[in-house]
């Protein structure tokens, strides 16, 4: 029986387990070799574990933190065996993630005292940003909220059209303008429309271009400033969407966007079919940003609220 608190439905847990299967099997095949013939956790085992964590895209800095924590546990209990290593690893990684966000993950909910709740979504093209927005709209509508989408990624006609398709599929209103329109103008109109409709949630899609950090910074700053003319404290969340299957490249994306704007949460997509699931742990720790959602499949239901305990349980069990 897991030592973690059970709050997921069995169906969601099964989806999570399946989505992380490749990361888990790759990790454990390496771990099994690392501890072969060993009964105690010694320096060689820890060195091997360090290599495994780095190769799983946990990242060097985060890996060293984890190893230091395990070394402390080993020094406190000289009789710790390799059979207990996995359990210790799970506990320490869960503790590390808890330091970034101590809250318990819940279903798709927003603060009750904020209306409309404004979520601005950033991320490079191709990471699944627009798809994530569509799935979020579906989940929030399913939870009983009135959702409005804003197509402020105006530099790609495909982005506007894709968001329109999601709006039609989910059955939520969308505010859009022509390709090349001012993104801030779209965001402004979206918030005005949301206020008029007494919407609960506004999700704003933004341009995913990284070729010029200064332009990106200026654009996102302007979008924020203009939104605040309608909703004073908007946006309430700036969520960076990253592709979990890209491994170390995801770290670079996070570095670029956190330099351009304040990022308050992460959504990690495409974790199914990749062995790079450790990126969830590394990016959250390195940038001190909580993971809110993870994508573990292509289905509309396969965007899940991130629960650190269930994630660690699925990854390391």
Task: Give each language-model segment a name.
Residues 3-10, 28, 35-36:
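Short, aromatic- and cysteine-enriched interfacial helices/patches
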Residues 207-209:
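Short glycine-rich anion-binding loops that position phosphate/pyrophosphate groups of nucleotides
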Residues 17-152, 159-179, 187-195, 199-204:
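Primarily NTPase-proximal linker/entry elements flanking Walker-type ATP/GTP-binding cores
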Residues 4, 10-16, 21:
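Switch/coupling subdomain of P-loop NTPase systems
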Residues 3, 106-107, 136, 252-253, ...:
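Short beta-alpha junctions and helix-cap segments that line functional grooves
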Residues 153-154, 244:
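Residue-level signal for short, function-critical loop segments
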Residues 60-62, 156, 272, 300:
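Short hydrophobic/aromatic residue motifs in ordered secondary structure
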Residues 162, 182-197, 211-317:
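Conserved catalytic-core segment of NTP-binding enzymes
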């Amino acid at each position: 029986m897991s030592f973690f608190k059970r709050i997921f439905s069995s169906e969601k847990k099964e989806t999570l387990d399946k989505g992380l299967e490749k990361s888990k099997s790759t990790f454990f095949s390496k771990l099994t070799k690392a501890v072969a013939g060993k009964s105690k956790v010694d320096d060689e085992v820890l060195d091997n574990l360090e290599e495994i964590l780095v190769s799983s895209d946990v990242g060097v800095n985060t890996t060293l933190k984890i190893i230091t924590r395990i070394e402390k546990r080993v020094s406190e209990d000289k009789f710790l065996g390799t059979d207990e290593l996995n359990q210790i690893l799970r506990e320490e990684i869960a503790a590390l993630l808890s330091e970034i966000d101590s809250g318990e993950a819940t279903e798709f909910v927003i603060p009750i005292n904020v209306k409309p709740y404004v979520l601005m979504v950033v991320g490079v093209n191709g990471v699944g940003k627009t798809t994530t927005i569509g799935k979020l709209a579906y989940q929030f509508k399913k939870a009983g909220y009135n959702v409005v989408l804003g197509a402020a990624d105006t530099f790609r006609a495909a982005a506007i059209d894709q968001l329109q398709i999601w709006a039609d599929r989910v059955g939520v209103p969308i505010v859009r303008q022509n390709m090349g329109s001012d993104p801030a103008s779209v965001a402004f109109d979206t918030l005005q429309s949301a206020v008029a409709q007494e919407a609960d949630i506004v999700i704003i899609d933004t341009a995913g271009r990284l070729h010029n950090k200064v332009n990106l910074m200026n654009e996102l700053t302007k979008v924020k400033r203009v939104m605040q003319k309608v909703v004073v404290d908007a946006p309430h969340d700036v969520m960076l969407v990253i592709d979990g299957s890209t491994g170390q490249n995801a770290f670079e994306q996070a570095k670029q966007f956190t330099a351009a704007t304040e990022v308050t949460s992460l959504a990690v997509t495409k974790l199914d079919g990749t062995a790079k699931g450790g990126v969830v742990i590394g990016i959250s720790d390195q940038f001190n940003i909580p993971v809110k959602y993870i994508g573990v499949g292509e289905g509309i239901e396969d965007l899940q609220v991130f629960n650190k305990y269930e994630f660690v349980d699925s990854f390391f069990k």
